[in-house]
UniProtKB/Swiss-Prot annotation:
InterPro entries: MttB-like_sf, MttB_Methanosar, MTTB_MeTrfase
Entry protein name: Trimethylamine methyltransferase MttB
EC numbers, comma separated: 2.1.1.250
Organism: Methanococcoides burtonii (strain DSM 6242 / NBRC 107633 / OCM 468 / ACE-M)
Function according to Swiss-Prot or TrEMBL: Catalyzes the transfer of a methyl group from trimethylamine to the corrinoid cofactor of MttC.
Length: 497
């Protein structure tokens, strides 16, 4: 099977899009990746996973744990992986399908370890995130109409060392949003607990739990070119239960991958595809995303910026690679290195949002993020909800047809008159973009309303949502059974200490 059988990396949706790779470029990245699979190969820490690779015909060195994957094994895995995934929410209106090259969706950032708390205009503080913060971020995302699913926004750090933190991080989001939930960086040995929570939600019906999972698992290979034991076990156990998985590389060009972005894409591609291959070897047809949180390492500052043009370019490139392989994509976007909601955040988030969106990535994650991905801000989430809304308007472009050309209305209104009272204008009052919290008043009206900066307006909105928004509840009997799994996990954790 040759790569000519694969998708050519072109968008299949209407509207504005960008194609910055030629087909020859995509084939070159793909070909270099196949070379990497042979030399130097992929180090696989998990013995069970190495056995699967060996059984499939891969060259496995048990001493070095390096696996060399033949091209035909990679091609077969790509072909068995589905190009379409349905993300089930607790409510029907929050269930949607993603397809390679299809519609763009959005989720919040995950996973931060701090919260940026608004105290007064221009005054913020950062604190360690807690389970309460996790619940509140889920509730606000449940309200936000431009956030289609919920990613684990912050860690429940108040459970660290006290109980099964990751199991709490499974249960709490499900209680506080009816949207699909991406569980980020969970624990491989605890997948059975996650599965038991899912079964309990469906009243013990395993068939329903397998066919309609309301959460997915996100895992990361270790750059460069390693898949650790935890990631391997997450793959093997999750696909066994029918839980979709998201393989997402977090490489840094110039540090854990080549400094040139084309080379970055080669190692990124090898890392993600190796995880996808493992998933398909374990369970052909397993639902997988091709993911990215890869960026460029800033060699002058010693940081990995996420508000950079490089992150936007890499995420857009990954969208094209996903289309090339006919796989749904999940990429970093709407990102910033700013510490508080400010002008830097607005610029960086708009840039890193539009690039992968116009390239056709299926899920863009990053809303609410601050400080290079360390911190989450509810106020920034509100601002990003508007940034995403405006980005969606850009993606629609300018349709040209008999209706939109408006020749009849131009001739009826004539010279020197206005179109405000025209029926066509009244019928399309919602056609123009209308942000929820961005201010479009003149200075005098803005001053009369209190001269509030955008973070203050966003804070007021967050306060209102947390006070008034009601998440669709889960039946109390089901909650009891789900909570019993969490309690059991906590007890097991404490007994193992």
């Amino acid at each position: 099977m040759t790569n000519e059988n694969l998708c050519a990396g072109r968008n299949r949706y209407d509207g504005v899009s960008i194609d910055f790779f030629s087909d020859a470029d995509l084939r070159a990245i793909d070909s270099a990746t196949m070379d990497v699979f042979q030399n130097p190969g992929i180090q696989v820490s998990d013995a069970e996973s190495r056995a699967l690779f060996k059984e499939a015909g891969c060259d496995v060195n048990e001493k070095t744990m390096v696996v060399k994957i033949p091209e035909h094994v990679v091609r077969r895995a790509i072909m068995t992986a589905p190009s379409k995934i349905t993300l089930y929410g607790r409510e029907k209106q929050h269930t949607f399908t993603q397809q390679a090259g299809g519609k763009v969706h959005y989720t919040c950032f995950g996973t931060g370890v701090k919260m940026c708390k608004y105290e007064a205009p221009g005054v913020f503080k950062t604190v360690d995130s807690t389970e309460e913060d996790l619940a509140n971020t889920a509730r606000v995302c449940d309200w936000a109409d431009n956030i289609d699913s919920y990613s684990l926004a912050v860690s429940a750090r108040d459970w660290a060392g006290k109980g099964a933190q990751d199991v709490h991080e499974t249960f709490t989001p499900l209680m506080n949003t009816s949207k699909h939930f991406f569980h980020i960086d969970p624990v491989g040995e605890n997948v059975e607990y996650y599965w038991d929570i899912l079964k309990a939600y469906y009243g013990g019906d395993e068939e329903q739990a397998r066919s309609r999972p309301i959460f997915s698992e996100l895992l990361c290979p270790t750059s460069p070119l390693k898949i650790g034991t935890n990631a391997c076990q997450l793959i093997l156990k999750s696909v066994n239960f029918g839980i979709p998985i998201n393989v997402i590389s977090m490489a840094m060009s110039g540090a854990s991958c080549p400094v040139h972005l084309a080379g970055t894409l080669v190692t990124h591609n090898a890392e993600v595809l190796s995880g996808i291959v493992l998933a398909q070897l374990a369970s052909p047809g397993a639902k997988v995303w091709y993911g990215s949180s890869t960026t460029a390492f800033d060699l002058k500052h010693g940081t990995a910026p996420v508000g950079s043009p490089e992150l936007g370019l890499i995420s857009a490139a990954v969208a094209k690679l996903g289309q090339y392989y006919d796989l749904p994509t999940y990429v970093a976007s709407t990102o910033t290195d700013a510490k508080v909601p400010d002008g830097q955040a607005g610029h960086e988030k708009t840039l890193t949002n539009l690039l992968p969106a116009l390239a056709g990535a299926n899920t863009l994650y990053g809303a609410g993020m601050l400080e290079l991905g360390m911190t989450f801000s509810m106020e920034q989430l509100m601002i990003d909800n508007d940034i995403i809304s405006m980005g969606k308007k850009v993606m629609k472009g300018i349709p040209v047809n008999d209706e939109t050309l408006g020749l009849a209305s131009i001739q009826k209104v004539g010279i020197g008159n206005n179109f405000l009272a025209h029926k066509e204008t009244r019928d399309n009052i919602n056609l123009v973009s209308s942000p929820d919290i961005f201010d479009r008043d003149m200075f005098g009206d803005w001053a009369a309303a209190g001269s509030k900066d955008i973070a203050t307006v966003a804070h007021e909105k967050v306060t209102e949502i947390l006070k008034n928004h009601e998440v669709t509840p889960i039946d109390s009997d089901l909650v009891r059974d789900m909570k019993a799994v969490v309690d059991r996990a906590d007890a097991d954790f404490r007994s193992s200490m």
